[in-house]
């Protein structure tokens, strides 16, 4: 079976494990993009530690959950955003102002929309979490 969107699959796995009350989950396959998104989620406090485990194939991430995620998901298509248009996308994907975060890929790497707004750089939307 072909996996069309590994990021969406990873976020769905995390959301489902969070919903049934698990303390950890396994995300496969691993990629740099998924690792960068997990790092941003960890910095924002939505997940605990995560580690890469080499299984001889693509690898897996073992993620420790802390029970703070209500919903998370990938944003498709990957919309391009500028610094002035973050608020429009926050209204579309997040339930309230200053609640949750958009995860953005920029020329300076993957970061939250708060960090991108502070650095005054735009990019493409990858995911949302709240």
Curated annotation (Swiss-Prot):
Keyword Calcium: no
One GO molecular-function entry: structural constituent of ribosome
Domain of life per record: Archaea
Organism (species): Methanosarcina acetivorans (strain ATCC 35395 / DSM 2834 / JCM 12185 / C2A)
Family: Belongs to the universal ribosomal protein uS8 family.
Lineage start: Archaea, Methanobacteriati, Methanobacteriota, Stenosarchaea group, Methanomicrobia
Assembly notes: Part of the 30S ribosomal subunit.
Keyword Zinc in annotation: no
The name this protein goes by in its record: Small ribosomal subunit protein uS8
Gene Ontology cellular component terms for the protein in this record: cytosolic small ribosomal subunit
PANTHER family linked: 40S RIBOSOMAL PROTEIN S15A
Protein encoded by which gene: rps8
Role: One of the primary rRNA binding proteins, it binds directly to 16S rRNA central domain where it helps coordinate assembly of the platform of the 30S subunit.
Keywords for the protein's UniProt record, in alphabetical order: Ribonucleoprotein, Ribosomal protein, RNA-binding, rRNA-binding
GO process terms (BP): translation
Cross-referenced Gene3D superfamilies: 3.30.1370.30, 3.30.1490.10
